[in-house]
Amino acid sequence: MARIAGIDIPREKRVEIALTYVYGIGLTRSKLILANTGVNPDTRVKDLSDSDVQKLRGATEEFTLEGDLRRKEGMALKRLQDIGCVRGRRHRMSLPVRGQRTRTNARTRRGSRKTVAGRKK
């Protein structure tokens, strides 16, 4: 297995797809990396030469990936919460952040329904 950015990428997949197993590399960025390094996207990972793997490692080092990217995103959310802006408060309360309605829907973000007893008449 080739190891890129601390992740073992699957041997049987095409390089173009296998690179997407690294957090922070999607299909578009994978294609960009392969174009810059000159590696054929249709090659299987198991068929890559050591020099190809080294090229890919070098190309991925210029991006923020894996743990660093997760930490960066976490710090951005923490900053929003610390300054007390609306987005930060919505994140803290586990509500939709981007203006969606919450009277109905938003079940994924709010969690499962809390049962409320009906009022007797």
UniProtKB/Swiss-Prot annotation:
UniProt entry tagged with the keyword tRNA-binding: yes
GO molecular function ontology, one term from the record: structural constituent of ribosome
Keywords, comma-separated and alphabetical: Ribonucleoprotein, Ribosomal protein, RNA-binding, rRNA-binding, tRNA-binding
Residue ranges, annotated region (Disordered): 91-121
PROSITE patterns found in the cross-reference section: RIBOSOMAL_S13_1, RIBOSOMAL_S13_2
Domain of life of the organism encoding this protein: Bacteria
Intrachain disulfide bonds: none
Biased composition (Basic residues): 100-121
InterPro entries: Rbsml_uS13_C, Ribosomal_uS13, Ribosomal_uS13-like_H2TH, Ribosomal_uS13_bac-type, Ribosomal_uS13_CS
Purpose of the protein: Located at the top of the head of the 30S subunit, it contacts several helices of the 16S rRNA. In the 70S ribosome it contacts the 23S rRNA (bridge B1a) and protein L5 of the 50S subunit (bridge B1b), connecting the 2 subunits; these bridges are implicated in subunit movement. Contacts the tRNAs in the A and P-sites.
Subunit field text: Part of the 30S ribosomal subunit. Forms a loose heterodimer with protein S19. Forms two bridges to the 50S subunit in the 70S ribosome.
Protein name: Small ribosomal subunit protein uS13
Natural source organism: Prochlorococcus marinus (strain MIT 9301)
Gene: rpsM
